[in-house]
């Protein structure tokens, strides 16, 4: 572990880490966003989620391997710095920070919109501000308070999914009182299992892969737990059943109980199922659950941005002020920085929703894939090095190395290329490329400045300054 990590308090318990890892899987994308995938893919959406989930399982296994060797709040940014080069750590760290800053704004706006469902007269901007401030204070107080909030947010989501699965299976097989078995006729009765063709399933993977962003947060949190190797190992090994049960299982229930082309599935598949089986106030219940998912994501976003900025500051790749810790070991200035820029994005949504805010949202669109790609490449290089120098440090190992690592890299590159041919995603890919280019240029400026400072500090060696890699 990096020595500088000693400043962060190790207050996250195993139960916190377990729920943080679960929270990363269950988000609003499952409760709401899955409807568009089902509507465009049909029952084959189950395959889309399974294949995308498999890719994320591979990524998490690789990240778990590296985290068990070096559990740090910098996580994959630090690993990229060590394995690929400082430019990679700098670039992916700042891109990831930017991604979550925008996510915080999106979730604050989404949460405010849900609350307006019950309280119509409260302005959207005010509710967004209140939600952001409350969860900012939670994160500022201590890492333990972040963990507690995330624990209960996650518990609500887990209980909801488990209840949904139990009730769904009961209606499918006719175990529910007064019900007839629904069976699996809806899986093939409306044009077959792949009514829109295999190509729609592959397209679905491109859309679905973004729903899993957040699973990697547990590796960032590893730097603040007393037993990081055990926590990361458990989280990494359990990601398989979490994705299968929560995502694939839930989508299978939806397409089994309702025809895939039902209009109400597009709006909210979970509400559609609950209304279909006669659950009273289904919309109200799901609004509360989605609000919980949104607040969980907002809470995680505030935590994640602060720790990534803290890690960048440790490596002198961000202002050193973001390394300052409170008495409880919290990087307060790093948290406030994420909150500040996120609320600027909220203001942009109020004044310029179709230009500035849309640009910010689209420009962060493909960053998730870049993060996954960097994780895979870092693991490929680090694993080869560790096998030669310190093989006993490998407490967790990626399966079938290096074959599955190469396969994952190829799959991610394939998804990035396919985005260029999908009208609804082309802008996201292009704008993410623009933002990535800006960050890379910033690194070159940063490197040049560091070289100049080093030369000024060592005038004897000015003629042959050491160039950073």
From Swiss-Prot:
GO cellular component, one term: plasma membrane
Catalytic reactions on record: 4-aminobutanoate(in) + H(+)(in) = 4-aminobutanoate(out) + H(+)(out); beta-alanine(in) + H(+)(in) = beta-alanine(out) + H(+)(out)
Biological role stated in the UniProt entry: Transporter for gamma-aminobutyrate (GABA). Can also transport beta-alanine. Can translocate several open-chain GABA analogs (3-aminobutyrate, 3-aminopropanoate, cis-4-aminobutenoate) across the membrane via counterflow against GABA, but cannot transport muscimol. Also functions as a low-affinity proline importer.
Name of the protein: Gamma-aminobutyric acid permease
GO biological process: gamma-aminobutyric acid catabolic process
Species per Swiss-Prot/TrEMBL record: Bacillus subtilis (strain 168)
Effect of residue 33 to D: Lack of activity
Presence of the UniProt keyword Ribosomal protein in the record: no
Parts of the chain on the Cytoplasmic side: 1-17, 61-94, 138-157, 222-242, 291-328, 377-401, 447-469
Primary subcellular site in the record, as a coarse category: membrane
Keyword terms of this UniProt record: Amino-acid transport, Cell membrane, Membrane, Transmembrane, Transmembrane helix, Transport
Protein family (similarity comment): Belongs to the amino acid-polyamine-organocation (APC) superfamily. Amino acid transporter (AAT) (TC 2.A.3.1) family.
Coiled-coil ranges from the UniProt annotation: none
């Amino acid at each position: 572990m990096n020595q500088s990590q000693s400043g962060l308090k190790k207050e996250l318990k195993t139960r916190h880490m377990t729920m943080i890892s679960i929270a990363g899987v269950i988000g609003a994308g499952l409760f709401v966003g899955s409807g568009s995938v089902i509507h465009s893919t049909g029952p084959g959406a189950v395959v889309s989620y399974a294949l995308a989930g498999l890719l994320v399982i591979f990524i998490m296994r690789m990240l778990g391997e590296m985290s068990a060797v070096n559990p740090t709040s910098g996580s994959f940014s630090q690993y990229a710095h060590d394995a690929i080069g400082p430019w990679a750590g700098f670039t992916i760290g700042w891109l990831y920070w930017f991604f979550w800053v925008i996510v915080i704004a999106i979730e604050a706006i989404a949460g405010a919109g849900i609350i307006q469902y019950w309280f119509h007269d409260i302005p959207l901007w005010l509710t967004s501000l209140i939600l952001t401030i409350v969860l900012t204070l939670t994160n500022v107080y201590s890492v333990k308070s972040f963990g507690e909030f995330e624990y209960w947010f996650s518990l609500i989501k887990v209980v909801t999914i488990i209840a949904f699965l139990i009730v769904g299976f009961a209606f499918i097989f006719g175990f529910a009182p007064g019900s007839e078995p629904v069976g699996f006729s809806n899986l093939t009765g409306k044009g077959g299992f792949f009514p829109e063709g295999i190509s729609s399933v592959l397209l679905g993977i491109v859309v679905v892969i973004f729903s899993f962003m957040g699973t990697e947060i547990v590796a960032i949190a590893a730097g603040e737990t007393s037993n990081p190797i055990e926590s990361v190992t458990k989280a990494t090994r359990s990601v398989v059943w979490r994705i299968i049960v929560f995502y694939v299982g839930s989508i299978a229930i939806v397409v089994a109980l309702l025809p895939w082309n039902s209009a109400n599935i597009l709006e909210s598949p979970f509400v559609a199922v609950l209304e279909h089986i006669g659950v009273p106030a289904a919309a109200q219940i799901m609004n509360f659950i989605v609000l919980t998912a949104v607040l969980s994501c907002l809470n995680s976003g505030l935590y994640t941005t602060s720790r990534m900025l803290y890690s960048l500051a440790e490596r002198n790749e961000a202002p050193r002020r973001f390394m300052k810790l409170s008495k409880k070991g919290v990087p307060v200035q790093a948290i406030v920085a994420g909150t500040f820029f996120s609320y600027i994005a909220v203001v942009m949504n109020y004044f310029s929703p179709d230009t500035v805010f849309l640009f910010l949202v689209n420009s962060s669109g493909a960053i998730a894939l870049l993060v996954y790609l960097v994780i895979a490449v870092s693991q490929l290089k680090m694993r080869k090095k560790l096998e030669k120098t310190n093989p006993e440090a490998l407490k967790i190992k990626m399966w079938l190395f290096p074959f599955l690592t190469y396969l994952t890299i190829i799959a991610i590159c394939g998804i990035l290329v396919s985005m260029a041919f999908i009208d609804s995603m082309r802008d996201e890919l292009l704008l993410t490329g623009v933002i990535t280019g800006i960050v890379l240029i910033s690194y070159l400026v940063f490197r040049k400045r560091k070289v100049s400072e080093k030369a000024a500090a060592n005038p004897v060696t000015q003629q042959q300054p050491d160039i950073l890699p």
